[in-house]
Curated annotation (Swiss-Prot):
Lineage of the species this protein comes from: Eukaryota, Metazoa, Chordata, Craniata, Vertebrata
Annotated positions of the Phosphoserine modification: S655
Keywords, in A-Z order: Chromatin regulator, DNA-binding, Isopeptide bond, Metal-binding, Nucleus, Phosphoprotein, Repeat, Transcription, Transcription regulation, Ubl conjugation, Zinc, Zinc-finger
Protein's UniProt name: Zinc finger protein 518A
Localization of this protein: Nucleus
Similarity comment: family membership: Belongs to the krueppel C2H2-type zinc-finger protein family.
Amino acid sequence: MPSEQKQLFCDEKQTTLKKDYDVKNEIVDRSAPKPKISGSIHYALKNVKIDLPKINIPNEVLLKHEVDKYRKLFQSKQQTARKSISIKTVSCVEECTLLHKSERAEEEGVKMSAKILNFSCLKCRDNTRYSPNDLQKHFQMWHHGELPSYPCEMCNFSANDFQVFKQHRRTHRSTLVKCDICNNESVYTLLNLTKHFTSTHCVNGNFQCEKCKFSTQDVGTFVQHIHRHNEIHYKCGKCHHVCFTKGELQKHLHIHSGTFPFTCQYCSYGATRREHLVRHVITLHKEHLYAKEKLEKDKYEKRMAKTSAGLKLILKRYKIGASRKTFWKRKKINSGSDRSIEKNTQVLKKMNKTQTKSEDQSHVVQEHLSEEKDERLHCENNDKAPESESEKPTPLSTGQGNRAEEGPNASSGFMKTAVLGPTLKNVMMKNNKLAVSPNYNATFMGFKMMDGKQHIVLKLVPIKQNVCSPGSQSGAAKDGTANLQPQTLDTNGFLTGVTTELNDTVYMKAATPFSCSSSILSGKASSEKEMTLISQRNNMLQTMDYEKSVSSLSATSELVTASVNLTTKFETRDNVDFWGNHLTQSHPEVLGTTIKSPDKVNCVAKPNAYNSGDMHNYCINYGNCELPVESSNQGSLPFHNYSKVNNSNKRRRFSGTAVYENPQRESSSSKTVVQQPISESFLSLVRQESSKPDSLLASISLLNDKDGTLKAKSEIEEQYVLEKGQNIDGQNLYSNENQNLECATEKSKWEDFSNVDSPMMPRITSVFSLQSQQASEFLPPEVNQLLQDVLKIKPDVKQDSSNTPNKGLPLHCDQSFQKHEREGKIVESSKDFKVQGIFPVPPGSVGINVPTNDLNLKFGKEKQVSSIPQDVRDSEKMPRISGFGTLLKTQSDAIITQQLVKDKLRATTQNLGSFYMQSPLLNSEQKKTIIVQTSKGFLIPLNITNKPGLPVIPGNALPLVNSQGIPASLFVNKKPGMVLTLNNGKLEGVSAVKTEGAPARGTVTKEPCKTPILKVEPNNNCLTPGLCSSIGSCLSMKSSSENTLPLKGPYILKPTSSVKAVLIPNMLSEQQSTKLNISDSVKQQNEIFPKPPLYTFLPDGKQAVFLKCVMPNKTELLKPKLVQNSTYQNIQPKKPEGTPQRILLKIFNPVLNVTAANNLSVSNSASSLQKDNVPSNQIIGGEQKEPESRDALPFLLDDLMPANEIVITSTATCPESSEEPICVSDCSESRVLRCKTNCRIERNFNRKKTSKKIFSKTKTHGSKDSETAFVSRNRNCKRKCRDSYQEPPRRKATLHRKCKEKAKPEDVRETFGFSRPRLSKDSIRTLRLFPFSSKQLVKCPRRNQPVVVLNHPDADAPEVVSVMKTIAKFNGHVLKVSLSKRTINALLKPVCYNPPKTTYDDFSKRHKTFKPVSSVKERFVLKLTLKKTSKNNYQIVKTTSENILKAKFNCWFCGRVFDNQDTWAGHGQRHLMEATRDWNMLE
């Protein structure tokens, strides 16, 4: 019995009953045979060998925490062993221990597939089972030196070597066993038994127990289970439940006890086992689990957000409307928004106390904050973030705060105040635009992906504030305008870095509405807004009083404090958007410069009365050509580069917007005048101004007159801005935001224009305010030193730049005029309009300050724009003539010094795209500057903007204001060009042309104060706004009407390398036989302003500007001997006083080809001079038949017409006395005045000797007086120059004859070179745009639009014509044209324009080329789709018509356009990959 009891006890613990049909591996270990079994049976069993496959555990739901538990068990390789029937006996203690452990393991739910051979360690005596290999390793590790034992399950055999054990097991294979299920006499070997079970007792792969519901797929497990039913069972006394182990029975008894160790928290369910409870919850309470999981996740995210939100700048990307641009917006933070608003309000109130403007602005901001409080975007936590952005809208520094207020306030209507970061009081985000206070530099560190979103990482570094103290702006205060805090964009680095890096947003700090410029990416400006702004601005202008300071204009609150707010509301918003757009177009990197479209300048002009910031906004706004007003002007813009068509449009637009409200202004075509010259430069100025709103607005206000003269000024500013944009440094010069529109605006423009890498503009570093700390900081040390030295050399001469930046340029009337010259802006003369400060010199364009005293025009009324400083007003009131001698001397000296400085600076600046010119031309006494009053005179502005040509715009004559007033003609070029001021029909100020690298300028200024500056952009080979001031930023002659002599000879602006500026008397004027040295020329200038012709060679030597002015005789001449001039006399009889004058301006582009252009010598200019020098009799007698006033002053820039060389001769009738507008119309807009970009100033002048020789030749033609000291930069040009000079005489005769004929305008064109015979390569050639297909865009090809030989210099060659026709025939299918040798040779030869019709026989004979006898057969590679119709026949299949719109796919992230869907999809995938690279990492 005892043994039996032992056995039962052991079995009790060994066997495991699976309740609830849980499958468990039960271990049946029989230590001894049951008493029932007979000895024979027992013996038979002894020999039984059971070989069973692995046991698979049925699939059950396991809890995660349980899986972890199991994993630990698995790691220890604990396995449930299945024991077959064994006869070996084990001691009771050992069996009980083992069984107990195995039971405990089973209770824990250990389910592992049982292996056939598993062994336990007899040393450890635990329940862990090992495979043979594992057991061996176990012994080596834990029982070193001992051998494992492998006991046989069938008998008592035990082996220390597994191989021996395996051999032993083979002895049991022959053992026969019975099937317990069948319970018949059949006996099977173990292998056959397994087969029997599988074939007989397996249903669908499962073995089902008949005594219970247990089922398994493993034969071995099933066999073990069957044997358990044959053993003693533990039955429940309360029910019929049978347990195979004592432990299971105890668990079962819990059911009857009424207590459940596991209860459901959602209902009253109870379970005895945890698995049951888990099943219950999963089945019935899933929703609770999901809710709980979400809650925990939210808590986790909040906890994480609290820890990281303050450390990073989180911006949310979203799209607005249909715009493809990417905007960034900050997440909202509910808490702290009220506090931030209150703080902002307090700051704004304080600012109001400081400045009148701030009052309204703060109010607006406050309202705006309250209104958009919900919309405000905050970082996720209100805690101060070390990194960046203050929740306060801007509390920049006090001065800066004001500016910041202005900018946002102006655009408050449509701008949202987004608070960037609690800590950054210096960073403000409004309407997706970031503004950083001037005393901080914002560095764009890059993008980071966090939580699947892209974040911008910015680094703010405090820097020394460059802004001048408000006190320094006292000059502006003089005007009575509220001084805007000079809130220069210290964000220069920020702007340049961020704007270039992020096309999305522009960071503007200007206090004016521009402070927040629209994202650079936005390339579009809504014309409607601009128009609205313009109209409002016009109203503002009307409200402005003449002499009232801007502050006085405060009555029109818009001008002063209101001006910031109102202008902001009207203009600023539009301006900001447009401005940003504008910037975007020109160059994202160059914020200030980027504004391409001068059109927007139009608005600026009107807001002249407004704060400079407002004007800037307008300028900026007109980034697009959309405005209809501008579109009217756009016709003349064909000269624009393919990509820059917008600029011309913008410029025109600007003029259009600047529509004067007074009909008088309209009559003077003020719109046109202002718009074009300023457009590009003005836009750039506006842009800069936007960064420095006060300065720009200030200059505009100066322009403003009661009638809205501001328009002209804004144009000028526009040009100015363009030049600034050219600045390479990318640093905005900080100029005071003085609202004194005159000085502050111009100066700020210069400064603001800090760095513009705009591809369109030459890089120009503003030397504008040399004395100002801000300006000097941005200049290289060597440049600053040179500039300082120059200033010291001539203390009497003041540069505009010398003025403190706060004052903007304190331009006296003269100075302001100089600025206008620099900017190349045209001021439209009107009774009420003063030209003062109208022509600010773009700081970037030329370092030289040109005295504008003479240039300043006082129109009609003595009332000055309130913005004009008192000093300027006084200077205007001063008699002009009294200061002439002094001015002339000063000017001559200044010119010399300028040239010296140029030579010095040349080396330093050659690397830069721009050249710095310093002209201490301003009178030592700026207050005494002379302002030229023109009653009927016209101002002819030739502005080159954005590399377009030099267009001349006709303007209305201005009535004489003073009896003494010198009539100045204003020609307003609808196209950018030079500004020429004609007084009494005289060309007075000629600005030297400036080349990007080298200052090759021989400036001949009739008047001492005018030193025009011409800039050539090296990269673009075009004259830039600097040029606007360019070819003599302004040509103006100042003299009393009595004393003025008409210029009879052509003016040629020729930059000379020589330090001395040479004035060359007109070839026609015989009176001046004296050699004009600088001193002589100055004297002569003083005495005879009109006579000396000006020769300017573009620094490249590619273009000479020939200005020929035929003027009616005036009864009173400054000096009678001048009148005696034969030429002059000739002129007199033909032109009685009051008769309209005709002015011929010729620009010769010597080279057709770029290569040729490089080699151009002065010869072209010389020849042009000679041609123009045709005896005054011819020109005058012919009365300049050039009836085509349309062509008047046509200057073409090659930039727009890449290979163009165009010489346009235009006669503009300038009625001296009559107020009629000059009839100068462009012959065709397509032929709009264009200056070949190649034709800059002809730098390639030969040495002085060659120039002397040339001039000696030219002398014979008409000017005995002229001896020119030309310094030619290229010695190689001598021969060319000689040849060119020899040729002109022949032309002369023809010209003379033509003039007599007074033929059709065509004849005139021919006369002046529109139809030319084959000439040397240097000869000028006319390009005609002739579309072979009506679908072909000829005027303004867009960006990447393929244009076939559009403006090619050889476009008219018959060979090219045939090729073009063939290309047009195949409608874009021609991929390649292989030209024959004959065609190539023909193209290499000079083009022959109608050789039989050539007027110059000599030339035709010398250069005559014969047309090819037979048409050239060219080989074309066609892209055609062929369809096979028969064996050897193919049919051309028409491809998709060009008219059919092709599918376009826009990138969702960057907006890039694709026409291939696959490419588009792949591109988007790369964005996704990049976005998810560092998904949750922000370092």
